[in-house]
Amino acid sequence: GLSPIYVNEIFDIIQKINADGTTVLLVEQNAKKALSIAHKAYVLETGNIALSGDAKELMNNDQVKKAYLSE
């Protein structure tokens, strides 16, 4: 994987692109990082949408916390 410095730089660039009015579709394994910058999110399991909704709500979802956020 990328070093944490590069990951942070890439996420900063993605946020700037989005702030300029461009929609960004992000597919990312780092759920915590992705949900922290997303507006809307989908959780996929075996290729199917298992959960969807507001990213902040998903970040606080008990299923998501247990399975993807190491909480």
Where does each model-flagged region fall?
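Glycine-rich phosphate-binding loops of nucleotide-dependent enzymes
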Residues: G1-E71
